[in-house]
Regions:
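Loop-centered beta-sheet repeat module
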Residues: 161-175, 179
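Extreme N-terminal starter segment of soluble prokaryotic enzymes
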Residues: 1-3
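Short, structural beta-strand-to-alpha-helix junction motif
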Residues: 17-21, 67
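Short, contiguous acidic and Ser/Thr-rich linear segments
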Residues: 10-17
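A basic, amphipathic helix-loop patch mediating RNA/tRNA/ribosome contacts
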Residues: 20, 26-50
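Fe-S ferredoxin-like electron-transfer domains
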Residues: 57-166, 185-217, 224-240
Length: 241
């Protein structure tokens, strides 16, 4: 165990923990957009930046990536931190000026208008946090989408912007997306997972008991093979089992 100081509070932490983990365990709020406790730390959004001091020197670090160490002093809302977060929110608001999640978070940090508004980001919702890509790979065990291109053309997409054979229609990407950039609709026995520049449709499995459509056939077949389940295991939905 090590002892650190966050905003004047002396706290004990395990050596392998990050500053963000310790802060959350102790009810100290640090904003994030790209972090999830079930995924490996990524440090994309930088909203979780804090100011650390040790040995008379201070610097700004991403709290989701920085491991705690004995005697570390952390400030989560110093003038440097607040200024840094405001700049990040200005850039995010410039990219996603009409997204309600970003507008609300920006407003909380005192940012009401973006400093500029490029036309190539018109109606953009994706903040490039990478949550969808990492969830697909780390949790689902697939690689249906990835971050492609560079600079202002950076975006999330399947290979060649074509429906990916790796996509099973589970919808985990849509569920984890913090801004609604990826969407999922179920209608008339079909599921559609889509974003701004790509989409894929899936046939839903129909329960043999209640007759309701309840999950994509590709997803169920993937699970069945992975767990070596009987061929008829998913003929009945969970509600009717």
């Amino acid at each position: 165990m090590v002892t650190i100081n966050i905003d004047g509070q002396k706290l004990e932490a395990k050596e392998e923990q990050t500053i963000l983990e310790v802060a959350r365990e102790n009810g100290i709020y640090i904003p994030t957009l790209c972090h999830h406790e079930n995924l490996a730390p990524y440090g994309a959004c930088r909203l979780c930046s804090v100011e650390i001091s040790k040995g008379g020197r201070s610097r700004i670090v991403a709290s989701c990536l920085y491991p705690v160490e004995e005697g570390l002093e952390v400030k989560t809302n110093s003038p440097r931190v607040v200024s840094n977060r405001r700049m990040i929110m200005e850039l995010l608001l410039a990219r996603c000026s009409q997204n309600e999640v970003i507008k609300r978070l920006a407003s909380e940090m005192g940012v009401e208008q973006p400093p500029f508004r490029p036309e190539y980001w018109e109606d953009e919702d994706c903040i490039l946090c990478g949550l969808c890509v990492r969830t697909c790979e780390e949790i689902v065990g697939r690689s249906a989408i990835s971050l492609v291109n560079r600079g202002v053309n950076r975006e999330v997409a399947p290979p060649f912007f074509e429906p990916s054979a790796d996509c099973i229609g589970c919808g985990a990407c849509a569920y984890i997306c913090p801004t609604g950039a990826i969407k999922m609709d179920d209608k008339d026995g079909t599921r559609e997972v889509y974003a701004r520049n790509w989409k894929k449709e899936f046939k839903l499995k129909k329960c043999k008991v209640c007759g309701n459509y309840w999950a994509p056939e590709e997803q169920l077949e993937y699970i069945r093979k992975k767990l070596n389940l009987p061929a008829d295991f998913f003929d009945v939905c969970p509600n009717c089992k």
